[in-house]
Regions:
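Internal, hydrophobic beta-strand segments that form the core of beta-sheet-rich folds
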Residues: 109-125, 133-137
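Short coil-to-beta strand junction motifs in C2/discoidin
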Residues: 64-72, 133
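Short amphipathic, basic-aromatic surface patches that mediate peripheral association
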Residues: 53-64, 126
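A glycine-anchored, Pro-Gly-centered beta-turn/N-cap motif
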Residues: 46, 70, 110-112
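Short, well-structured beta-strand segments within conserved domains
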Residues: 48-52, 103, 112-120
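Short, compositionally biased P/S/T/A/G/V-rich stretches that sit at domain boundaries
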Residues: 23-45
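Contiguous beta-strand segments within globular domains
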Residues: 42-57
């Protein structure tokens, strides 16, 4: 009997611990994020201004745990997929966080071809379930 209680306790602890970073913040059906002012195939010049659109949810700063909200992340020349969707989005030059609730960014991109994608993160920078992600677009910077 003690063995059964120990196993049940361990399973419950694992379930609670795993839920903390499991990417389980729900996104409402039909929620979407998109680029407002650029599209796939565009040729751009520096400085590049990118505007972020969001439908079906609200924008809130990182750390604000409020239902149906999140904040933007701009993914440059990278992908977020598989198990990465259950983890906080990295913060580096390819994964730009807008934890203050920003909906626009002006930046310098090196000349050449780049892929861009928007991913909405929850209060703790983890993508929602299901993930709210734009289509990945390809742009050329002159």
């Amino acid at each position: 009997m003690n063995k059964l209680i120990a196993i049940a306790s361990l399973a419950a602890t694992m379930a609670v611990t795993g839920a903390a970073f499991s990417g389980e913040t729900p996104a409402p059906e039909g929620a979407s994020v998109y680029f407002i002012n650029i599209k796939d195939g565009d040729t751009l010049t520096n400085p590049v201004t990118i505007q972020f659109g969001l439908k079906g949810m609200g924008v809130a700063p990182a750390g604000t745990e409020k239902e149906h909200t999140g904040h933007h992340h701009l993914i440059i020349n990278e992908s977020i997929e598989g198990e990465e969707l259950n983890e906080p989005i990295p913060a580096d030059d390819q994964h730009i966080h807008f934890g203050g609730g920003q909906t626009e960014k002006t930046l310098e991109l090196p000349a050449g071809t780049h892929t861009l994608q928007l991913v909405l993160g929850d209060w703790s920078h983890i993508p929602h379930n299901p993930p709210v992600m734009s289509e990945k677009i390809t742009v050329t910077v002159k």
